[in-house]
Amino acid sequence: MQYYSTRNSNKSVNFAQAALTGLAPDGGLFVPKEIPQYPANVKTSLGTMDFCDIAYETIKPYVEGEISGSALEDIVRAAFTFNAPLISVADRYAVELFHGPTAAFKDFGARFMARAFSFLRRGEDRPLHILVATSGDTGGAVADGFFDVPGIFVTVLYPKGRVTPLQERQIAGLGKNISALAVEGSFDDCQQLVKAALADEGLKKRMALSSANSINISRLIPQAVYYSAAAGKAFAGFPDPDGEATPRLAGYKTSAVPGALPVTLCVPSGNFGNLTAGLYALKMGAPIHQFAAATNINKTVPDYLDSGEYLTRISQATISNAMDVGAPSNFERMTAHFSWDEMKRIILGVSVSDEETRKTIAQIHEKTGYFLDPHSAVGWKGIDKLILENKIKNSAIGILCTAHPAKFSETVEPLVGPIPVPASLAHTMERNVNAKTIPADVPVLIETLYEKN
């Protein structure tokens, strides 16, 4: 598979070059020259296939010729030691993406990426320096995924005071080859700093650089896997391959035959890498009817879907902090594959306030006993609004639950009481934070990187 920049389709690179470079030299994002199709037998079996088998079939065409079939098999089975179960809650599914080591959906992409990088760089002596901007969960997942990986050093930039105490310990509590910089600014500032550093010619001569944000195609592609797995189960209603029957909705069809309910997947969205991965799954042949892109008050893309005009803005802080993005990077990828008219047909945009988010967390727990984190609650409320507006009808609905609610206990527990805490998160709170504070200034960041390396 060849990849080209969203800003120049005339020059292409292979998967290894796209992944290890991260950002194209012209500042664009790498996209595949074509989005491959699942073989017919895979399309019809998504509802019953093992998660790692779906991962293998999804990723294989993107890395063909560079990662052998046996190596890819080893990578996906080492990366995906956890699943993405569908849980029936009221009239919809919760697609739980928080069963990885840092309890966030970012674990899927980060763990694959770390193992793929190790394979692609085998025999390489020069260290690789990875820069990553985070609004919360990406930093923790990347830090965990790359922790103690030989020959790779990671620097995580996060907005000071805008991540939770637990997120900060995941980002800045590991040490060894993981460093953290607390930036006096927003996530958008962190993202711009990373892009500027990756484009700096002097820095590139000094060290091998890459990024682990969703601007890196190798982190985005594996996220398509859970879309195909979830849509396959939701559309087909087949038993879970791990032995537990997938809960069914009222009126739900039991096989993928004409008349089965179309699938709507709601994606809590900020930087729009997650939704872009879903669009890849759709184009590959996953049985997805449409998406709902649910944002907080940082609603750049919902406004674009309404008007056709793309206007970035300064991000505003909310309780769903991982989605506090006013200039989503992956919008470039979306427009590389889809026109505005095409997006309008398959993506419903909706925004949700903090007040609505809090009410949703409390109401869903009171009615069902289910715990939602603030981001997943944005998705839940977004679906409620779209149903009231008659934009979603007769659909099997899945909410992508992107983080464990215990990661946001400061917001959630006052609304619903104590939350069961996974052992991995309880252990994380014992770490000490070790981060250097810097201003949102490119020369300061570059000087800091020179000092560290």
Regions of interest found by a model, annotated:
Residues 1-453:
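PLP-dependent amino-acid enzyme catalytic core
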